Amino acid sequence: MTAILERRESTSVWARFCDWVTSTENRLYIGWFGVLMIPLLLTATSVFIIGFIAAPPVDIDGIREPVSGSLLFGNNIISGAIIPSSAAIGIHFYPIWEAASIDEWLYNGGCYELIVLHFLLGVACYMGREWELSFRLGMRPWIAVAYSAPVAAATAVFLIYPIGQGSFSDGMPLGISGTFNFMIVFQAEHNILMHPFHMLGVAGVFGGSLFSAMHGSLVTSSLIRETTENESANAGYKFGQEEETYNIVAAHGYFGRLIFQYASFNNSRSLHFFLAAWPVVCIWFTALGVSTMAFNLNGFNFNQSVVDSQGRVINTWADIINRANLGMEVMHERNAHNFPLDLASVDAPAVQG
């Protein structure tokens, strides 16, 4: 018997690295987008944790009145936040080497820009990594498309809005109470609750939650029993089996009788497309709404639009919202200006003497 030995071609370190990065056999897929994503998100997370614990106060309004946001400077988990960059910086790119010292960089809120820019690039790379893994496995690309909705929303809030307003100091603080403060100020300045794209976003979030709960409960309630009544129904299935685990006809029949026939899907692909598309499209619209309000194309304004025959204003709910908006606008940045912009820009009424 003759044995033939073949010499294995030696592959370079770079080739082996490429094979490892793009291998779908790894426990966690890395991918070329992952090579970028991992350091970006690690940087954003590390700086966020350190800043949340120990960052010194930041001169957010650019008026030499620093605002404390970290735990070591008197905050708790609820009130703590990474304070946005100073209005004195505006939307300038402000890396560490642009400041005269680390103290100056911290005082002007350099942490915020560093975290936000690394985070946005990181989540964009995560989306690319989803597409990359789908491509390697021969799957369709819609997982990454669905993830584009939260990526668009984060980009609108953390990047487009500050650009439109002219300063990263108008971005959302990275904390619990800071998020609510951002929402209140956004309503005061842009009347977002009266913007149709925000209304679509609310419908997407609440509707998506409702549809998810309905779908999950219907599927769980219509499992095809493969076991005896003395065993768990879960024991009758194995991961990756070809046979369906639930009876869509039974689920369709139940829901059709519960509401009406045409309110229920009888096609699994149509159903799951709808479950994915509804929240994704609605969040796309919300991101688009925030991006337009960034440039002050605001929500509907029906203030004092109802008057009687004598021209006297008949107050409506819109006027009450307007008064609430003015109150919120007066309260924020209270030391940066004497009047809210809406009041300061109106001509003073003539005084009869």
Curated annotation (Swiss-Prot):
A Pfam family matched in the record: Photo_RC
Modification after translation, per record: Tyr-161 forms a radical intermediate that is referred to as redox-active TyrZ, YZ or Y-Z. C-terminally processed by CTPA; processing is essential to allow assembly of the oxygen-evolving complex and thus photosynthetic growth.
Positions of modified residues (Phosphothreonine): T2
GO cellular component: chloroplast thylakoid membrane; photosystem II
Enzyme class: oxidoreductase
Residues where pheophytin a binds: Y126
Residues binding a quinone, per UniProt: H215, S264, F265
Cell wall biogenesis/degradation is among the record's keywords: no
Remarks, miscellaneous: 2 of the reaction center chlorophylls (ChlD1 and ChlD2) are entirely coordinated by water.
Protein's job: Photosystem II (PSII) is a light-driven water:plastoquinone oxidoreductase that uses light energy to abstract electrons from H(2)O, generating O(2) and a proton gradient subsequently used for ATP formation. It consists of a core antenna complex that captures photons, and an electron transfer chain that converts photonic excitation into a charge separation. The D1/D2 (PsbA/PsbD) reaction center heterodimer binds P680, the primary electron donor of PSII as well as several subsequent electron acceptors.
Protein family membership: Belongs to the reaction center PufL/M/PsbA/D family.
Listed name of the protein: Photosystem II protein D1
Organism field: Nephroselmis olivacea
GN (gene name): psbA
